[in-house]
């Protein structure tokens, strides 16, 4: 698209009730429905569909064939008003799908800032994704999944409904988790993913020093290597958390579980 070309392709269909910032670009054959709000600097590529109620922040990029804000894939959904809220500077690659929430699940799906969602990623109804995450090709989140900041999910990996994935966690290629994944943890590629240590390389890249990583490793060994019952492991983590905010974050995550902890 040149500087002199129209920012909205003539084949795009935009509902009069949609609200787009002046500099939003919309590609060929894209559909933008009513009650959609798109912030400044956002680029919507060709053959995309965005349905409302959906709120999209600034400087996002939707590559071809992304389907955003569609109805939840939940038989209990009865047409009630629900929404999708997306923050700033996210990238949605080819054929990504993100669904709105359900009335019974809180009514909202949220995506934070600075996330990369690669081709064929699916984010289901009532999910909540933090900031600076990378979802590789064919990542699948079932309904009501919560993902913390800086999570990396490898290709063809997925999470069972209602699972939580803690900040800085890493899921390997094809890993499927049916339980909560504590912060900093790596999940292997078994038929159902199992913890395989902490995400040391990712933490180093984000500026965690040796002392912080050592404390996280100690907590991981307490939780997964020592063979302790969960209640006893939590007691030891409580002691360790007094000297480490990172261990405290792990303990807080465990204390607020809705699904069984992945062990």
UniProtKB/Swiss-Prot annotation:
GO terms for molecular function: acyl-[acyl-carrier-protein]-UDP-N-acetylglucosamine O-acyltransferase activity. It comes from the Bacteria. InterPro entries: Acetyltransf_C (IPR029098), Acetyltransf_C_sf (IPR037157), Hexapep (IPR001451), Lipid_A_LpxA (IPR010137), Trimer_LpxA-like_sf (IPR011004). Its EC number is 2.3.1.129. Pathway: Glycolipid biosynthesis; lipid IV(A) biosynthesis; lipid IV(A) from (3R)-3-hydroxytetradecanoyl-[acyl-carrier-protein] and UDP-N-acetyl-alpha-D-glucosamine: step 1/6. The keyword Cell cycle does not apply. It catalyses: a (3R)-hydroxyacyl-[ACP] + UDP-N-acetyl-alpha-D-glucosamine = a UDP-3-O-[(3R)-3-hydroxyacyl]-N-acetyl-alpha-D-glucosamine + holo-[ACP]. GO terms for biological process: lipid A biosynthetic process. Gene3D superfamilies: Hexapeptide repeat proteins, Udp N-acetylglucosamine O-acyltransferase, C-terminal domain. GO terms for cellular component: cytoplasm; membrane. The keyword Lipid biosynthesis applies. Keywords: Acyltransferase, Cytoplasm, Lipid A biosynthesis, Lipid biosynthesis, Lipid metabolism, Repeat, Transferase. Homotrimer. Involved in the biosynthesis of lipid A, a phosphorylated glycolipid that anchors the lipopolysaccharide to the outer membrane of the cell. HAMAP family: LpxA. Belongs to the transferase hexapeptide repeat family. LpxA subfamily. PANTHER family: ACYL-[ACYL-CARRIER-PROTEIN]--UDP-N-ACETYLGLUCOSAMINE O-ACYLTRANSFERASE (PTHR43480), ACYL-[ACYL-CARRIER-PROTEIN]--UDP-N-ACETYLGLUCOSAMINE O-ACYLTRANSFERASE, MITOCHONDRIAL-RELATED (PTHR43480:SF1). This is Acyl-[acyl-carrier-protein]--UDP-N-acetylglucosamine O-acyltransferase. It comes from Stenotrophomonas maltophilia (strain R551-3).
């Amino acid at each position: 698209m040149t500087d002199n070309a129209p920012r909205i392709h003539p084949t795009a269909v935009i509902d009069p009730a949609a609200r787009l910032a002046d500099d939003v670009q919309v590609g060929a054959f894209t559909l933008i429905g009513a009650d959609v709000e798109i912030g400044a600097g956002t680029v919507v590529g060709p053959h995309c569909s965005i349905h409302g109620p959906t709120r999209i922040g600034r400087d996002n990029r939707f590559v071809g064939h992304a389907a955003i804000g569609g109805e939840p894939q939940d038989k209990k959904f009865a047409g009630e008003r629900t929404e999708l809220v997306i923050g700033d500077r996210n990238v949605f690659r080819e054929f990504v799908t993100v669904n709105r929430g359900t009335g019974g699940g809180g009514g909202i799906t949220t995506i934070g800032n600075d996330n990369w969602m690669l081709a064929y990623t699916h984010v289901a109804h009532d999910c909540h994704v933090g900031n600076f995450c990378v979802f590789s090709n064919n990542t699948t989140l079932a309904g009501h999944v919560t993902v913390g900041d800086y999570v990396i999910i490898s290709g063809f990996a997925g999470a069972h409904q209602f699972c939580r994935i803690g900040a800085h966690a890493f899921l390997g290629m094809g890993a499927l988790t049916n339980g909560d994944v504590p912060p900093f943890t790596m999940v292997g590629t078994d038929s159902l993913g199992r913890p395989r240590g902490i995400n040391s390389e990712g933490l180093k890249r984000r500026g965690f020093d040796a002392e912080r990583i050592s404390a996280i490793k100690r907590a991981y060994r307490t939780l997964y290597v020592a063979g302790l019952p969960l209640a006893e492991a939590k007691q030891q983590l409580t002691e360790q958390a007094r000297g480490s905010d990172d261990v405290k974050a792990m303990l807080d995550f465990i204390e607020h579980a809705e699904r069984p902890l992945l062990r």
